[in-house]
Amino acid sequence: MTQIKDPLNNYIDNPEKGAHDSAQWAGKWTTERYTAKKRANFEAVDSYLSQPVGKLLDIGCGFAHESRCFGEKYGTELWLLDGNQKNNVDKSDTASYGKWNTTTDDLYFYHTFDFLDAKLQELGTKNYHLIDTNNIDIAEDVKFDLITSWLSCGHHYPVKTYIDLMKKHSHKNTRIILDIRCKGTKTNFIGVDGFEIVNVVSDAGGKKRATVEIKLI
């Protein structure tokens, strides 16, 4: 539930604001231009990997555009991890870009899971599990072939936030590909802690970000 502050500075539920914000984000995330960019992301990574993906974890999935492309091409089973609006306070959709947040008070806008699940189904997403970041419930024996995060882990918050999760659900051949924020140049990566850069998959983000393969250490 999206929340606002009352006169005593306490958070109160504001379902109308939440529904309005969800509709605005849905509009942004389903334009032809936006979806074309997401398709290009998939094509770059798919070409780089050059192999089918059986199980995929998408951290900060949103509408899971890239992950859905893997599902369409390979029948990939998807684990889609995202925040639930019911657990987060109201934030402006213009205030979050580039700021790293690691505490509950700093979490940004999310959809409710009911809205997100309905939208994923509307977009034709198949064979997926929607996972709440505040209640991660993935079976111990699930190991992913590919772990991804697009404009989320490594971009809006440090990679180390989910390093333990990545380690827990990786096998010896797991590939991890993330959008990493850069500073000044496309190779001056921010927040490299607990992992190494293996390769730059795409530098389409210019001097602000790059899509990279990483190796956990």
Locate predicted features.
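A short acidic, Gly/Pro-enriched loop at the edge of an enzyme's catalytic core
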Residues: 136-147
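Conserved beta-strand signature within the Rossmann-like core of class I S-adenosyl-L-methionine
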Residues: 173-181
